[in-house]
Regions:
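Short helix-loop-beta junction
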Residues: 1-7
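Residue-level signal for the nucleotide or nucleotide-sugar donor/cofactor binding architecture
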Residues: 17, 90, 183, 212-215, ...
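A short, sequence-level motif marking secondary-structure junctions
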Residues: 133-139
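Short, solvent-exposed turn/loop segments enriched in Gly/Ser/Thr/Pro and often Arg
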Residues: 13-14, 39, 208-212, 240, ...
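Conserved C-terminal portion of the radical SAM core fold
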Residues: 33-35, 61, 196-206, 231-237, ...
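Radical SAM [4Fe-4S] cluster-binding motif and immediate context
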Residues: 140-294, 298
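Glycine-rich beta-alpha loop elements in corrinoid/cobalamin-binding modules
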Residues: 9-133
């Protein structure tokens, strides 16, 4: 935050690093406040690190944020007495407010935790206080973080031009955020040009359904085509059935390797698609994938999810064969993950859904798919990865 007198350091680690080395690095920085980002792939690691950090830095203030703690923030604080609080949902403005509370400031000295939306925190008397969720922010207000590209050498660049999702897929947290917002195209063009000028190898768009708004998608794809540097690749997650003729014609004209498309089919069982609240026109998916493949210039990655409701082993074989027949460049078989806060979690009893207690909460069995069939599909997953 520009109006707060605080020094912020970004410390990035991976779950493959030695825990002791990370702990030593955190300790050497001697921060007064530490914030951890919590995701499905790092939650166990982060919780263990929080406990260790508090043992060696007893006076440090520790906050957590991210999707893995946003939807059960009270339980997280109960489980981790080392935590002062949890940031729920979007963190940009919430973090800035926390900096005002804890930073060395004068004009905002009256600000207290009780006035900040989007947090759950431990009160001085030990009780847990929960504030309302923060109103979704204007995406054009999100700062651009890639000014110093030396810090991101040999790394994939993750970039966002929209938040929220128009769909309601029951297994996905994006369906909770119904307020679909887009970043200003002027900002997007400037930032894309920055990546192109620096000749970054890949920019991965994290928009949940990039082509849900035709004008937005076309403007960005046209800019990428017209300013192609011959090096940078752009990755998009799209709904293939939403692609229209104009978009497909443009995609077919692009340099081989300029963009790649990830298409989540998940299942071709109509009962499954209906039950998970997904909207998909399979024949249009098939037709559009074929039209793009015909030109041979675009890498297409298609996804399936095992363990969805109404999908038994026989049904999944058909889904697999249907997607395989589309001849994608890559077919990925994943397994249902029952995410906190998702509708799938609410329906676990009705679906007789059994899943692992630890992240990533992967399915073990359902009313339609016994564990013996999950084992068989695991073998298929390994073969798909190899070949």
């Amino acid at each position: 935050p520009q109006d707060v007198n605080v020094q912020i350091e970004l410390a990035e680690y991976t779950i493959n690093q030695n825990r002791d080395e990370i702990l030593k690095d955190i300790y050497r920085r001697q921060a007064e406040m530490i914030c951890f980002s919590c995701y499905i792939w790092n939650l166990d690691y982060v919780e263990s690190m929080i406990r260790d950090v508090k043992k060696v830095m007893k006076d440090v203030i520790i906050w957590a944020g991210g999707p893995e703690v946003s939807y059960d923030s009270r339980e997280t604080l109960g489980r981790l007495p080392e935590l002062t609080g949890v940031m729920k949902g979007e963190g940009e403005k919430t973090f800035a407010k926390l900096c005002k509370v804890y930073g060395k400031h004068s004009e905002t000295s009256e600000l207290s935790l009780e006035q900040i939306d989007g947090i759950t925190f431990r009160c001085p008397d030990g009780t847990i206080c929960e504030r309302p969720w923060r109103v979704p922010m204007d995406l054009s207000e999100v700062p651009f973080v890639y000014h110093d590209m030396k810090k991101f050498e040999n790394k994939i660049i993750y970039y966002e031009t929209s938040r929220g999702c128009p769909f309601s897929c029951s297994y996905c947290l994006s369906s909770i955020d119904k307020q679909l917002r887009f970043r200003s195209l002027d900002l997007v063009f400037n930032e894309l040009q920055f990546f192109l000028d620096h000749k970054v190898p890949q920019v991965k768009f994290v928009d949940r359904t990039f082509n849900c708004k035709h004008d937005h998608a076309m403007a960005i794809w046209k800019y990428i085509q017209e300013h192609d540097n011959g090096i940078t690749n752009f990755h998009f997650e799209v709904a293939a059935d939403l692609l229209n003729d104009e978009e497909i014609r443009l995609i077919r004209q692009m340099r081989p390797g300029l963009i790649q498309l990830e298409i989540g089919v998940q299942s071709t069982n109509t009962d499954t698609i209906r039950e998970i609240r997904r909207t998909m026109r399979l024949e249009e998916v098939r037709e559009h994938v074929a039209r793009i493949k015909e030109k041979g210039n675009i890498h297409q990655h298609l996804d399936l999810i095992a363990g969805l409701p109404y999908e038994d082993i026989k049904s999944f074989r058909k889904s697999f064969d249907d997607v395989y027949s589309m001849r994608p460049d890559q077919l990925q078989l994943g397994f249902l993950k029952v995410l906190k806060g998702s509708y799938m979690q609410e329906m676990q009893q009705e679906y007789e859904l059994r899943y692992k207690d630890e992240p990533p909460y992967e399915v073990l069995s359902t009313k339609w798919l016994p564990y013996s069939d999950v084992i068989e599909l695991k073998g298929i997953e390994e073969m798909v990865e190899i070949y």
